[in-house]
Swiss-Prot record:
Belongs to the phosphoglycerate kinase family. It comes from Campylobacter hominis (strain ATCC BAA-381 / DSM 21671 / CCUG 45161 / LMG 19568 / NCTC 13146 / CH001A). It is found in: Cytoplasm. The lineage of its organism: Bacteria, Pseudomonadati, Campylobacterota, Epsilonproteobacteria, Campylobacterales. This is Phosphoglycerate kinase. It is an enzyme of class 2 (transferase). Keywords: ATP-binding, Cytoplasm, Glycolysis, Kinase, Nucleotide-binding, Transferase.
């Protein structure tokens, strides 16, 4: 594949400007208070490194999906305030991206100062990978660093097109991006065995390609969450009103067959917590998967399944987990996900957690510090596991024949 250009390889000149593409797409409540700042904290090492090299830093990110230009609820101003608090320093903020205000703010930026531009997606050119928009961003700085792993699977202007305006000595990946790519590479190419993959979440469709790519590489595969019911249907169980992707029943069966052929042990739920509706007030009961009542739906794994999955994890040396075991947002259906988090955290394995929902489960379970690595990217993390090349990584990779001797 070649080698990823690293921020450490750049010979920065004191007083020059660095443009860092970050992923500050953080959740906020209705009052625009940031409810989880993991992504902000994850960007700090690269920002600090560039400041220590004597540069001034321009930060850029998107937040949410604004439809038509500026929308106050998608402004990055709360991010600037949180970053200032986390870094214990002033973070300048401009309510603009490529207009006069932004150009002026960049021009006036002094050595060792940090400026955050407003939401890149307020400009249509960002998601269109528009070279003119990218050129305007590139004109701000002498160097370009991408530390936004969460958007590397998207060919957007600040991720892909912008790199065409920098040579290999002036562009690179930040520490977070390199860490993310290395963890994914080690998982799929050099896992310490036994290697157990845990797949959950609502849909098979979102993880189908990842499951297919992982199957020849893992020793065990654990399937939970809403997606498990498509597998249960595939082997002939009645699943009531549980989530079902009818068009993927055959694919689910193929995965089970392929697992058997490869000698991979595949674990699916043996019991479930079921209810007639997805509600905290709903009546619920624990049944075996053979006894799901008509009109009821499975919303969490049951205690027998928790015990089975814990046993499957007991000898693991590498664990990859993507997707909760149930509707964890509702307390009464969160037990399976939280117990799974505890089991993975207590293992002696290298543990890699992917996906925003899964990271939320781990945080809620109080296990964040016990996991080896929690990925900041959902879609990007899955695509790497699927074996795909990410546009944002490709443009920062020197092919072997381009490497300097």
């Amino acid at each position: 594949m070649g080698e990823i250009l690293s921020v450490k390889d750049i010979k920065f000149k004191k007083g020059e400007k660095v443009f860092i593409r970050c992923d500050f797409n953080v959740p906020m409540d209705e009052f625009l208070n940031i409810t989880d700042d993991r992504r902000i904290r994850a960007a700090i090492p690269t920002i600090r490194y560039c400041l220590d090299e004597g540069c001034s830093v321009i930060l850029a990110s998107h937040l949410g999906r604004p439809k038509n230009g500026y929308e106050a609820k998608f402004s990055l101003e709360p991010v600037a305030k949180r970053l200032a608090r986390r870094m214990n320093r002033e973070i300048k903020f401009v309510n603009d991206v490529i207009g006069k205000e932004a150009v002026e703010a960049v021009k006036n930026l002094k050595e060792n100062e940090v400026l955050l531009l407003d939401n890149l997606r307020f400009e249509k050119g960002e998601t269109k990978n528009d070279p003119e928009f990218a050129q305007k961003l590139a004109s701000y700085a002498n160097y370009y660093i991408n530390d936004a792993f969460g958007v590397c699977h998207r060919a957007h202007a600040s991720v892909e097109a912008i790199t065409k305006f920098y040579d290999n000595k002036h562009k690179a990946a930040g520490f977070l991006l390199i860490k993310e790519v290395n963890f994914a590479a080690n998982l799929t190419k050099r896992p310490v065995r036994p290697f157990v993959a845990v797949a959950g979440g609502s849909k098979v469709s979102g993880k189908l390609q990842a499951l297919k790519n992982l199957l020849p590489k893992v020793d065990k595969l654990i399937i939970g969450g809403g997606m498990a019911f498509t597998f249960l249907k595939a082997i002939g169980y009645e699943i009531g009103n549980s989530l079902l992707e009818e068009d993927l029943v055959e694919e689910a069966l193929n995965i089970l067959r392929e697992g058997k052929r490869l000698g991979v042990k595949i674990y699916i739920p043996v019991d479930a917590i079921v209810a007639p509706a997805i509600s905290q007030d709903s009546v619920m009961k624990n049944v075996t998967v053979q006894e799901i009542p008509a009109g009821w739906m499975g919303l969490d794994i049951g205690p027998a399944t928790i015990a089975l999955f814990r046993e499957a994890l007991s000898d693991a040396q590498t664990i990859w987990w993507n997707g909760p075991m149930g509707v964890f947002e509702i307390d009464k259906f969160a037990r399976g996900s939280l117990r799974m988090s505890h089991a993975i955290a207590e293992s002696n394995a290298t543990t890699v957690v992917g996906g925003g929902d899964t990271a939320d489960v781990v945080e809620r379970a109080g296990n964040s510090d016990e996991m080896t690595f929690i990925s900041t990217g959902g879609g990007a993390s899955l695509e790497l596991i699927e074996g795909k090349e990410l546009p944002g990584v490709r443009v920062l990779t020197i092919k072997n024949d381009e490497m300097e001797c």
